[in-house]
Amino acid sequence: MSKVIGIDLGTTNSCVAIMEGGEPIVIANSEGSRTTPSIVAFADNGERLVGQQAKRQAVTNPENTLYAIKRLIGRKFDTEAVKRDIAISPFKIVKADNNDAWVEARGKRYSPPEISAFVLQKMKQTAEDYLGQTVTDAVITVPAYFDDSQRQATKDAGKIAGLNVLRIINEPTAAALAYGLDKKKEEKVAVFDLGGGTFDISILELGDGVFEVKSTNGDTFLGGEDFDQLVIDWIADEFHKDQGINLRGDKMALQRLKEAAEKAKCELSSSMETDINLPFITADASGPKHLTMKLSRAKLETICGELLAKLEGPCRTAMKDAGLSASDIDEVILVGGMTRMPAVQKKVEAIFGKTPNRGVNPDEVVAIGAGIQGGVLKGDVKDVLLLDVTPLSLGIETLGGVMTKLIEKNTTIPCRKSQVFSTAADNQPAVSIHVLQGEREMSRDNKTLGNFELTGIPPAPRGIPQVEVTFDIDANGIVHVSAKDLGTGKEQSIRITASSGLSKEEIDKMVRDAESHADEDKKKRDAIEARNHADSMVYSTEKSLKEFGDKIDAVEKGNIENKIVELKKVMDGEDAEAIKKATDELAQAAHKLAEAMYAAKEQPGEHGETGSGEQARKESGKDENVVDADFEEVKK
C-alpha cells in the first residue's frame, strides 16, 4: 500500500501531513511554507494559479480570484448564508441548474468541489515532491458540524483531484488525535476549533489509544472571514465619514481593504495598536486619496463583540449533550488561527473556567491528526481506536409534515437504525420517503438530503402495509437510506449523493479535466526547468567564449555562436523537448571550448611555482629547508 497523506482542507489555508518513521510530519510547499492559502485564481493568459501565487495577484484581479470556497461547498444558492456571501464577494456566485451555489471566473462556471479540488491537487503535488513518488490515498478533514451534502461534496473534491479518499474525518477529532496520541492517562477534552470559515466544539474522552467523541456542535458560517468582514466594514465606514467616498463600489479597493483588515487583526494579537496605511486607495476630482488610520485591540474587540458572543452557545450545548459541566473538562485545546486572538482566548477561559492549552500549533494540528489517521488506516499506527459521532439528527417526514428522527445527533458512527412505518391512505400503491437532517420538529425547517419512492405496494387498507426504513451512516458520516416492503420483500435504496450537486457524469468529466490540466501543468513545469537549464548553459558558454574564444579554431567558434543563437530562439517557446535538444547541441559544440579552458589552466602561470619561482630560489642561494611563510599585518 502506498503512502496515505492527511489533508486539512481549510477555508483560509490548507496543510498536508504524513507519517514517517512513526512520527507525523507537516510537509512544506514549493514556496517553503507549511500552510498554503486556499485560493484559486485565473489569470489573463488563462493560467490557473493556486495558493500563494493566487493570493499575491488578488488585488489586481479580484473578480477572478476565488477564496473561502469551503463556505459554499454543499450549499444551495438561495440559503441565507450564501446570500450573505454574495453581498460581499468580489467574484460572482451563481445559481447552478440544480440550485447549488457555484462560482464564475473568466466567463466559466465552476462548482465548489471543483475549486476545492484545485487546492487539493496543490497539496497532493506538495506531498509527491517531498516523497518522490505518486500519492493517491488520502484522509481529508471537514468541520465536525458539516452536514451530509458538505461531506459528500468534499469527497467529490478529492475524487476530482485524483485522490482516493479513504476517510473523511472531523477537524476537532483530528486535532484531539494529534494532541492525545502519546497520552496514556484518561482525560476529558474540549476541542475549540475556530478557523477561517467555521466554528466547531467537540467534547471527547481519550486515554490509552481510545478517542471517543461524546458530543459535537458548531456553526459552519462563523470564522476568521466574518471577523475580517467586520473590520473591512469599520475601515470603509471611517473612510466614508472622513472623505465622503464609499469604497464598497470599488472591487480593487475592497480587496486591498480585505488584506489590510486581515493584517491588522493578526497584528493586534501581539500588539495593542496597529496602523492601517493604504496609499492611493482611490481618487476624486481633487486628486488621489490615501487611507491612514489607527486600530486598537480594544476597538477590534468592540467591533467583533457580536461574533465573540456567538461562540458561547454551541459550547454550552456540547457540554450539555455530553452530560458534563465545565468543571469536568480536564483540558481545552485551541485549534484554528482565530484562537490566537486574545479576546477569543478570554472567551474560552470564561466559558470553561480554565486557561486553554496552547501546546499545539493551531494551524497544523488538524493536518497532523489527519496524517495519523492515515497511518492508522494503513496499519502503521497501532492501538488507536477513533469513535466519532454524527453531528445532526437524521429522519424522515411523516404525516402532518413532522420530522420523525431515526438517528439522534451525537450517535457514534458507523451506525445503522431501522424503524417500521405504514401507509397513510387506503390502497396506497407507493410510499414517498423524504430524508431529512436537522434538529427542528417540522420537516420544512430541516435540510432535505434526498427523496425516493418505494413503489409496487399491494392494495390494502391504510396502516396495514409494513414499510421498514433503514438509515446507515458510514465512518465518513455519509448517509445511505433504504426502504423495504416487509410484505413483498421489495426494496428501494438511496445513497445520498445528489445533494452534493454533482452527478457521477459531472464528477467524471471534472476528473478528466483535472487530469488534462495536470498534464498541462507538468508540461509548463518541464518547460520552465528546461529553460532555466538552457539559460545557465548560454550564460556559462558566452562567458567562456569571451575568455577563451581566441584559443579555438574560428570555425569551431562560429559553430558555438550559431548554437547559442538557435538555443535563444527556442527558449522563448513552451516546447521542453526542443529546448533540451538545443541545449544538448550547444553542450556538444562547446566541448572544444572546454578542452581549451582546461589546457589553459594546466599551463604554468607567469609567476607559477614551477619555473621562475623555483629558479629564483636557487639563484638567491636560499636554504632548501627554510619554509617561506605568509604573514598578515593586524592593525589595532
UniProtKB/Swiss-Prot annotation:
Protein keywords: ATP-binding, Chaperone, Nucleotide-binding, Phosphoprotein, Stress response
Compositionally skewed regions (Basic and acidic residues) per UniProt: 603-625
Keyword Chaperone: yes
Molecular function, one GO term: ATP-dependent protein folding chaperone
Induction profile: By stress conditions e.g. heat shock.
Modified residues (Phosphothreonine): 198
Location of the region described as Disordered in the Swiss-Prot/TrEMBL record: 598-636
Bias kind Acidic residues: ranges: 626-636
Signal peptide bounds: none
Entry's family note: Belongs to the heat shock protein 70 family.
Protein role: Acts as a chaperone.
Protein name as it appears in the record: Chaperone protein DnaK
Organism of origin: Pelobacter propionicus (strain DSM 2379 / NBRC 103807 / OttBd1)
Lineage: Bacteria, Pseudomonadati, Thermodesulfobacteriota, Desulfuromonadia, Desulfuromonadales
Gene this protein is translated from: dnaK
